[in-house]
């Protein structure tokens, strides 16, 4: 018989009370699928397991897992309490959790005396998404008064730290005012820096919210024993879990674009290696020419498999030899040595027949070339990065099954051989046949269109 830690029965009892009594008093309907999902979340957390939870549209899955996580966290011993991580695919869901779901739920639970302090949460994202006050001041001083829209966006940035919420901010300005990878120790705004204050204010949140890429980046840091991006956590919820394999494929794909090549040459020139920069541009240009397709390029992004022709082999070898030579210069700065070695390492993959890599060339709509080396071991990498930690995990989405079967999703997520693995399905309460509308675009001809009679 399974024995549960103290608080298991109380958590399930309180979940029933919240969904059947408390939330209805605040104009929320009782949904049986939502209650069942909350109980599944609690069982998964207390058993320290992984659960695949498919919850159809209208189930109320977000509130279900939030209540489950809060009740579980509430009933844990104080010394064992750590944050819970919620990973999503979309910024919209992150914002909804942070500004709607959690504040409303926190207020209700405080009012009912279930919790004694507000639930705290923070969205974790890369520092390049936040405003650097020093760089903002410098950038604002350079923009002409006639550029009213640009001036207005920069003025808004003085009061909004997160650049994702600044309207009409150009990509160019984002790059010029974002927090740098390394803040100078002698920064004149360090004591008044909004970003540093943001970090201080959210050192110990109850819930950390991030996107799938940030979650995977944190896992990579842990495996490589580098400083973690997320504070150590005790449970993980992956919402929009059907998007996690796509994020992993992106994360585990190395790329070298035409812009990367141009940037590297520009950095060399700025570091007073003009002759070497010119030589590198020449071999990069030869490499790009060797990869030009023999067919007419369509006006859209395309990807084609990479094949190693003698011309390409010679061009790549020339690039690698020159990159090695430049990197060996005694007065070469460390940051440039790193960039040169990184570029060399990726190009070397295109010379070797690496069985764990899928090599292809990507061309943008305007014909710009990118070398791509994708891993064909994404499921294994996901398992190593996320599931082998044995932290309780809930993966939820409205689309995790195919004809009621989780097998395909388990394969993509690296969970095919994982045990024990829980499964849960809640059908959408909506009657799609009666309530869905079919919209037909205006250009479609109705002459030969036959609509169903039922």
Question: Which stretches of residues belong to each language-model region?
Answer:
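N-terminal pre-P-loop "Q-motif" helix
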Residues: 29-41, 45
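Structural recognition of the conserved hydrophobic beta-strand(s) that form the central parallel beta-sheet
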Residues: 86-87, 210-211, 237-238, 393-396
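Walker A/P-loop
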Residues: 48-65
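Walker A/P-loop NTP-binding motif
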Residues: 63-78
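Signature of the SF2 helicase/ATPase Hel1-core->accessory helical subdomain module
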Residues: 190-204, 212-311, 401-412
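Conserved small/polar residues in nucleotide/adenosyl-binding loops
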Residues: 447-453
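A substrate-engagement module of RecA-like helicase motors
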Residues: 2-24, 29-32, 76-208, 212-213, ...
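A contiguous, basic/glycine-rich beta-loop/short-helix subdomain that forms a polymer-engagement track
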Residues: 184-203, 221-227, 328-436
């Amino acid at each position: 018989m399974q024995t549960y830690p103290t608080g298991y029965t109380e958590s399930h009892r309180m979940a029933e009370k919240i969904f059947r009594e408390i939330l209805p008093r605040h104009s929320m309907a009782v949904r049986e699928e939502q209650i069942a999902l909350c109980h599944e979340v609690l069982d998964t957390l207390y058993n320290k397991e992984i659960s695949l939870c498919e919850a159809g549209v209208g189930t109320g899955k977000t509130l279900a897992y939030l209540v489950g996580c809060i009740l579980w966290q509430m009933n844990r011993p104080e010394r064992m309490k750590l944050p819970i991580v919620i990973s999503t695919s979309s910024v919209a869901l992150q914002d909804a959790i942070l500004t709607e779901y959690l504040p409303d739920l926190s207020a209700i639970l405080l009012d009912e005396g279930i919790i004694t302090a507000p639930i705290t949460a923070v969205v974790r994202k890369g520092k390049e998404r936040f405003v650097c006050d020093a760089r903002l001041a410098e950038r604002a001083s350079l923009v002409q008064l006639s550029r009213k829209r640009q001036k207005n966006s920069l003025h808004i940035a003085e009061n909004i730290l997160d650049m994702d919420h600044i309207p009409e901010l150009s990509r160019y300005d984002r790059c010029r005012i974002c927090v740098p990878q390394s803040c100078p120790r002698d920064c004149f705004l360090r004591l008044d820096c909004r970003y540093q204050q943001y970090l201080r204010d959210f050192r110990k949140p109850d819930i950390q919210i991030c996107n799938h890429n940030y979650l995977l980046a944190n896992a990579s840091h842990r495996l490589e024993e580098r400083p973690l991006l997320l504070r150590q956590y005790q449970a993980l919820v992956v919402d929009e879990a059907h998007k996690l394999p796509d994020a992993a494929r992106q994360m585990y794909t190395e790329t070298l674009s035409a812009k990367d090549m141009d940037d590297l040459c520009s950095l060399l020139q700025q570091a007073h290696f003009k002759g070497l920069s010119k030589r590198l541009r020449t071999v990069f240009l030869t490499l790009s020419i060797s990869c030009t397709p023999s067919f007419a390029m369509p006006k859209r992004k395309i990807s084609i498999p990479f094949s190693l022709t003698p011309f390409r082999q010679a061009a790549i070898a020339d690039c690698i030899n020159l990159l090695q030579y430049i990197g060996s210069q005694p007065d070469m700065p460390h940051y440039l040595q790193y960039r040169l070695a990184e570029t060399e390492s990726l190009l070397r993959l295109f010379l070797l027949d690496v069985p764990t890599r899928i090599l292809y060339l990507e061309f943008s709509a305007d014909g710009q070339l990118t070398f791509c080396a994708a891993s064909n071991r994404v499921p294994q990498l996901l398992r190593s990065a996320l599931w082998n930690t044995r932290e309780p995990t809930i993966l939820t989405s409205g689309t995790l099954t195919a004809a009621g079967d989780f097998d395909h999703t388990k394969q993509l997520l690296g969970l095919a051989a994982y045990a024990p693995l829980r499964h849960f399905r809640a059908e959408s309460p909506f009657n799609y046949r009666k309530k869905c509308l079919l919209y037909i675009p205006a250009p479609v001809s109705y002459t030969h269109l036959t609509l169903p009679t039922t």
